[in-house]
């Protein structure tokens, strides 16, 4: 190839500079929008042609070249045979180095009117421009097509003709800028060395962001095809019909240069071979343009067309080649418990377009949009950072004493500290024992003790101590006694004493229910059915814990069923209380309340008798009918 061709290639480099290589912020570190290096996409790949000179047998061919005054030189003729390297003119010759092999070319068979040259790529590439250097006269008509689906469908890039209107019915871009047809590269001169140039970034695309959807539609290709539709003769060819037939009826091309780059959406500056692709063995393949991007900006895919697995917190975008903005993918906040996440547009919109990442398959017993909490059955170990694989520990709840999730057989605990939710009456961090005052650990929890204090957690038997005295099994049978005291018992004034402990030494007058008028005349504040639970010796007085089982009457104080304290006032110098209240027994008690303190008082004016249903009915009748 001559100096003209070399200058043409240098000019092609300026086209590159005006195209993708002019992206703002291109740097080796790809800090902003970036693009891989440009190169000849035909290098290392197979170019196809319909025919080849000498494909089946040796052929004779001739060609003209003109002088500077356009007069013809003597034609030169030679032989071609595709089977012999020194006589072959194969399609691969169009893709070798124009500088190292300037005298190599492809040539079609003789007498061919239509020919096709095609480049098939193994992936999507960005195509920027085409340079075709002809050895034969340029065609009178040709079409440049591209495919973006590996040859399934084709679209025209440009039509070339000496007369666009007559040949294709199209306007000429020499007359109307931007027209799809041109007559600029269809002159038969020069008879050899004529070029055809197409720039994919011609107006109106040359001012666009090179990674916008509009420009991608223009630049992306998987296949490129040139259809040579009409030959034309060199104008200096002689027309002497008496001469022997000359062999000029063929197409011949020195170079077929397809300039482009790996297609990476502005997110890579280097590419590697596509998996499984094997380059054609030919000179110059060291400079081959590969098709798989080495993605930056937290992107992934052969063309950096989506975000990396853990970087989907915002929607993927191509880089902006006009401003240089990289539009990096952003990491999802998965707290170290997920390997991937996905973008959810609903989450994105709900957050005000701030965060749309949802973590996938949370690991280490976590769950949630960000794997931000321990899943049911596990709790947060505050001694470990939450990003640690063992930050969520399994709940250790007792299977019998702990509650379970509704419609679930799995026990759970407080995810913040591991405390288990216990069944009624059950205690312990693991819910593995009865609370104090409860017994009978089982499937339904624990039952309340029938005592004022604690009881045996297994049997429910009341447990006595020197301060809380449970006498359920120790009190003597109730016997009516008279009001005649036994000889005095010497004791220190400061010493407290429980009448219940020494009830046998107290002689109290037996009470009977007299007439209704006398009962009503006492104007009792309360009338209760109670069960005596225990007595507490306070030193200066006695407190009796009872369980109120029924409220027959209450006045100013609101009295409810349940545990309550009675305060006996009858305190002799021997420490006896009357009337006697024996633990474990049920009584009907009518007494007065201390308005100032709210205490329920029991004294000699109180009415106390063992509970009988008949007694209860009789007192209720008196309260309703007589005590008005």
From Swiss-Prot:
Q: What does this protein do?
A: May play an important role in neural, kidney and vascular development. Promotes neurite elongation from olfactory bulb explants.
Residues carrying a glycan = 56, 163, 353, 483
Q: Which Pfam families match?
A: EGF_laminin, EGF_LMN_ATRN, Laminin_N, NTR
Q: Which GO terms describe its biological process?
A: animal organ morphogenesis; axon guidance; basement membrane assembly; cell migration; neuron remodeling; regulation of branching involved in salivary gland morphogenesis by extracellular matrix-epithelial cell signaling; substrate adhesion-dependent cell spreading; tissue development
SUPFAM superfamilies referenced in this protein's UniProt entry, alphabetically: EGF/Laminin, TIMP-like
> Where are the annotated coiled coils located?
none
PROSITE patterns per record: EGF_1 (PS00022), EGF_LAM_1 (PS01248), EGF_LAM_2 (PS50027), LAMININ_NTER (PS51117), NTR (PS50189)
**Gene that this sequence comes from:** NTN4
**Which GO molecular function entries does the Swiss-Prot or TrEMBL record give?**
laminin-1 binding
Q: Where in the cell is it found?
A: Secreted, Extracellular space, Extracellular matrix, Basement membrane
Cystine pairs annotated here are 262-271, 264-293, 295-304, 307-329, 332-341, 334-359, 362-371, 374-392, 395-413, 397-420, 422-431, 434-446, 506-576, 520-627
The record's tissue-specificity note reads: Expressed in kidney, spleen, mammary gland, aorta, heart, ovary, prostate and fetal spleen.
Name the keywords, alphabetized: Basement membrane, Disulfide bond, Extracellular matrix, Glycoprotein, Laminin EGF-like domain, Repeat, Secreted, Signal
This protein is called Netrin-4
- Magnesium among keywords: no
Q: Could you tell me which residue ranges the Laminin N-terminal domain spans?
A: 30-261
Q: Where is the signal peptide?
A: 1-18
According to its UniProt entry, this protein's organism is Homo sapiens (Human)
